[in-house]
């Protein structure tokens, strides 16, 4: 694939598996939802080759930021998702959100991203769709508030 990440067909399986495993061990599951801001405009004005290059760089930055046990997925178009097991929301923000924004800024000075973070509690049951939807909603809050930002429940 273009980005070297799993595609959306793997997402539901990854989240469901992570939730089941985490529930047995009383660990949290965190979803990070990432969107490349103004991607359509970039594609339309700078061309699809530039758009593909941006997607490859973002995919690479996501893989570099993730741990071995994390699932990195290209959700579609310019949207990505990382599923983290046993990673608290604050830790996800410090380790992933800030690092990812910084890495993308270093490689793509003219591109910004918006990130949403959602987490289940250690003993809380949430289905996969609800967790992803919440991370997506928080990504839109980050996008409206300030581009190149992340939104967690505590921010």
PLM features: what roles do these ranges have?
Residues 67:
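Short conserved AdoMet
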Residues 109-114:
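PAS and PAS-like sensory/regulatory domains
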Residues 4-30, 37-64, 73-77, 81-82, ...:
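Conserved long alpha-helical elements within nucleotide-processing catalytic cores of c-di-GMP signaling
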Residues 48, 97-101, 105, 120-155:
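Catalytic-core segments of nucleotide cyclases and related cyclic-nucleotide turnover enzymes
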Residues 82-87, 119-120:
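Short beta-strand-to-loop capping motifs
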